[in-house]
């Protein structure tokens, strides 16, 4: 079996896997944390300028860019939403560690 087949098998198995309630709880916390950092960061510089520079009029409308509701390519939306989250994240306020894992992962996952 080649590597891509192994990866595909893993993805199929994960789609039907039942997650523990604690895993779902922590995933929800990561999404909420990401949104809480992304939303205020989206209106702070340099994010309005980044949106103006990266969103093209003819782009395929594949994924949403917050908070404007603009659509862009998947890569551009992930970049812009991730940049917004990183603008206002505070690494020192997460009680269980000095990080915000959602800021680096949720935008790309969506």
Which residues make up each language-model segment?
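N-terminal core-entry segment
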Residues: 1-110
């Amino acid at each position: 079996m080649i590597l891509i087949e192994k990866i595909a098998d893993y993805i199929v198995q994960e789609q039907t896997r039942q997650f523990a309630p604690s895993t779902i709880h922590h995933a929800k916390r990561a999404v909420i944390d990401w949104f809480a950092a992304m939303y205020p960061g989206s209106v702070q510089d340099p994010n309005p300028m980044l949106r103006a520079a990266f969103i093209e009029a003819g782009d395929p409308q594949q994924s949403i860019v917050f908070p404007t509701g603009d659509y862009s390519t998947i890569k551009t939306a992930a970049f812009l939403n991730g940049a917004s989250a990183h603008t206002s994240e505070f690494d020192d306020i997460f009680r269980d560690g000095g990080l915000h894992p959602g800021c680096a992962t949720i935008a790309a996952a969506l």
